[in-house]
Amino acid sequence: MEVSGKTARQLFAELRATPGRARYRLGKRPALINVDLQNAYTRPEEFCTAYDGAPGQFSHVNALAAAMRRLNAPVIWSYVAFWESGEDCGVFGSKDDNADSQQNVKHGSRRAALDERLETAPSDILFPKRMPSVFHETNLQSLLTWRGCDSVIVTGGSTSGCVRATVVDAMSRGYFVCVPIECVA
């Protein structure tokens, strides 16, 4: 562990600039997983749960999604949404209970809807999820196996939260993983 006054971005920049560092690679059949790019987390002018993404994040995500479609690769959009009762949120929603609480992102609500700045296509796959990782209790693993995917490119909102959880689960399942820094918050 390094103890310093450097920011995480500074440490990351130093790591990327390390001479002789082995280049990370993707496999032969990637899928794109876009995590929680929904209004509850992308519209700070509307929702206190939202945050600002990287400059140009949506244009980068849209360009990447278009490129993946041209390759006939799966383009997946996950979003958080819960039952009207909020019971399916479990411990994840037990921290607090107010209008902005996690369990109050309801299916079909404006908070659950994908941000309108995203360019989706009819061939894209939408996954509702209830926990941080897109893999948790969804059929994502089956879909990736069926489509023959060996790697995933992950974009999204909270890099330290749901993006990270999805990345850890993907790597734990043996996928090569890439997180484009231009495509995350």
What is each PLM-predicted segment?
Residues 1-120:
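Active-site acidic carboxylates
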Residues 70-73, 148, 174:
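Glycine-centered short loops/turns at secondary-structure junctions
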Residues 107-156:
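Internal catalytic-core helix/loop-beta-alpha segment
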Residues 153-156, 174-185:
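A short glycine-rich beta-strand->turn/loop micro-motif centered on a GG-aromatic cluster
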Residues 159-166:
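Short glycine/serine/threonine-rich phosphate/pyrophosphate-binding segments
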Residues 170:
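Short conserved active-site loop signatures built around small residues
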